[in-house]
Amino acid sequence: GFMDLIKKAGGWLKKKGPALIKAALQE
């Protein structure tokens, strides 16, 4: 349910977060 979505979002952010931050800083 809802908690599963939060867990998935958290896992995705852990994977993608650093790359997104790097991309944002480089702009």
Swiss-Prot record:
Expressed by the venom gland. InterPro entries: Poneritoxin. This is U1-poneritoxin-Na3b. GO terms for molecular function: toxin activity. The keyword Secreted applies. Belongs to the ponericin-G family. Keywords: Antibiotic, Antimicrobial, Fungicide, Secreted, Toxin. It is found in: Secreted. GO terms for cellular component: extracellular region. Its main location: secreted. GO terms for biological process: defense response to bacterium; defense response to fungus; killing of cells of another organism. Shows a broad spectrum of activity against both Gram-positive and Gram-negative bacteria. Also has antimicrobial activity against S.cerevisiae. Has insecticidal and non-hemolytic activity. Pfam families: Ponericin (PF07442).
